[in-house]
């Protein structure tokens, strides 16, 4: 069976995702499409708008054959780690092709750039450090400066969010298994961060979440496949954002000592002190970010750091594993064919997982389900089984 892997968040699953999924199957001639998906919290450092099990249902209903959870310790980090660990999972489950959307749309350029970075690793790292020192800028900007210095302006614009992820997928594949084929298609109509829906059928997940959180589900439904609309209408819980967790974060920052926070993943350069001061003044999460941000810390980096503090995520990361959230008959057939040759631990029943393997994930789910209205999902890692569809 020919397998194609995709890395997703489906926050929520919309028409752009449906187009991407259909193209992944068609262009790679895949027998099975396997999605590695963020769980309760996503890469921008935010809570997912609905629980991971509902988003897995959306994926399966739209045609994904298997949904694997990207562990929270990787799903909520910067592009390098996010991509490395997603590719590690897809490689372990033996995908032939990694398929992704990008603003650039030419897979060969991603592969070429990744090979060049691997070949010039010392020079590239030196260029990053020079940019950090000379320009007193964020790591992301320093990385972009080093990339431009190495390749010039024209090869690949890694200031674009999907290009940077695509580049890190290519880099991870080069480092882990260069035989994984890469394919990409250009994103259509909506930019990743577009906050307004400006096309008849395609809008960014950001714009769709904005509509849903404003109580405009019917308006948002123009940009969702029928299967996603049905799941959202049947969903009985709240639609979530940082406002549902702000009081928990505020308490954590006020209650904790500065030294205690130093050991949290992503906390550096004394940023915890600014955050603790802001927590006593801010009225909401948006105020908090505005009061905390600096030239070196983008809003997204601050959100990620705030999330790690909320989750009490220590600097060490967890070991990778394959946690299956759901699969259809094709996915089950593929798993049975390859199960004996998969190098990572496979988790279908959490209670049978090796002790400590899912510790951070379980804590993240417990914190996520503190939001009012999620009582049915509390301890869901234990009582909600993988979703199996025909």
Swiss-Prot record:
What cellular component GO annotations does this protein have? cytoplasm
Specify which residues bind ATP according to the UniProt entry for this protein: 7-20, 101, 162, 187
> What InterPro entries does the entry give?
Rossmann-like_a/b/a_fold, tRNA(Met)_cyd_acetate_ligase
Q: Does the keyword tRNA-binding apply?
A: yes
- Name any Gene Ontology BP term: tRNA modification
GO molecular function, a single term: ligase activity, forming carbon-nitrogen bonds
Q: What is its EC number?
A: 6.3.4.-
Alphabetical keyword list = ATP-binding, Cytoplasm, Ligase, Nucleotide-binding, RNA-binding, tRNA processing, tRNA-binding
| Cell compartments where the protein resides | Cytoplasm
Name the catalysed reactions.
cytidine(34) in elongator tRNA(Met) + acetate + ATP = N(4)-acetylcytidine(34) in elongator tRNA(Met) + AMP + diphosphate
Q: Which Pfam families match?
A: HIGH_NTase1
Q: Which family does it belong to?
A: Belongs to the TmcAL family.
Query: What is known about what this protein does?
Result: Catalyzes the formation of N(4)-acetylcytidine (ac(4)C) at the wobble position of elongator tRNA(Met), using acetate and ATP as substrates. First activates an acetate ion to form acetyladenylate (Ac-AMP) and then transfers the acetyl group to tRNA to form ac(4)C34.
Quote the protein name from its UniProt record.
Answer: tRNA(Met) cytidine acetate ligase
- Which gene is transcribed and translated to give this protein? tmcAL
């Amino acid at each position: 069976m020919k397998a194609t892997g995709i890395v997703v968040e489906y926050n929520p699953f919309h028409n752009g995702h449906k187009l991407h999924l259909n193209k992944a199957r068609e262009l790679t001639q895949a027998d099975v499409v396997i999605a590695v998906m963020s769980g309760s919290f996503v890469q921008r450092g935010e809570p997912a708008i609905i629980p991971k099990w509902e988003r897995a249902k959306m994926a399966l209903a739209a045609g994904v054959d298997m949904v694997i959870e990207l562990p929270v310790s990787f799903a909520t980090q910067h592009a390098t780690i996010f991509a490395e660990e997603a590719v590690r999972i897809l490689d372990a489950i033996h995908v032939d092709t990694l398929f992704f959307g990008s603003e650039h749309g030419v897979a060969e350029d991603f592969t070429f750039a990744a090979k060049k970075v691997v070949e010039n690793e010392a020079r590239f790292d030196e260029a990053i450090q020079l940019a950090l020192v000379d320009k007193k800028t964020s790591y992301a900007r320093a990385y972009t400066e080093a990339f431009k210095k190495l390749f010039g302006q024209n090869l690949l614009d890694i200031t674009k969010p999907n290009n940077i992820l695509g580049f890190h997928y290519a880099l991870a594949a080069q480092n882990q298994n260069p035989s994984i084929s890469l394919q990409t298609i250009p994103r259509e109509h909506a930019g990743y961060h577009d906050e307004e829906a400006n096309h008849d059928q395609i809008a960014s997940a950001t714009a769709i979440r904005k509509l849903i959180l404003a109580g405009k589900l019917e308006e948002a439904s123009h940009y969702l496949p029928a299967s996603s609309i049905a799941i959202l209408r049947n969903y009985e819980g709240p639609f979530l954002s940082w406002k549902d967790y702000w009081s928990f974060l505020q308490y954590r920052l006020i209650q904790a000592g500065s030294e205690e926070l130093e050991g949290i993943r992503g906390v550096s350069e004394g940023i915890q002190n600014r955050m603790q001061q802001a927590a006593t003044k801010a009225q909401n999460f948006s105020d908090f970010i505005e009061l905390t941000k600096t030239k070196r810390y983008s809003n997204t980096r601050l959100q990620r750091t705030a999330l790690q503090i909320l989750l009490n995520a220590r600097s060490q990361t967890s070991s990778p594993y394959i946690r299956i959230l759901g699969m259809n008959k094709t996915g089950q057939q593929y798993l049975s064919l390859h199960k004996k040759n998969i190098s990572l631990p496979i988790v279908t029943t959490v209670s049978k997982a090796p002790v400590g393997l899912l510790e951070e994930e379980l804590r993240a789910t417990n914190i996520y389900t503190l939001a009012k209205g999620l009582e049915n999902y509390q301890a869901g890692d234990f009582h909600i089984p993988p979703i199996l569809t025909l």
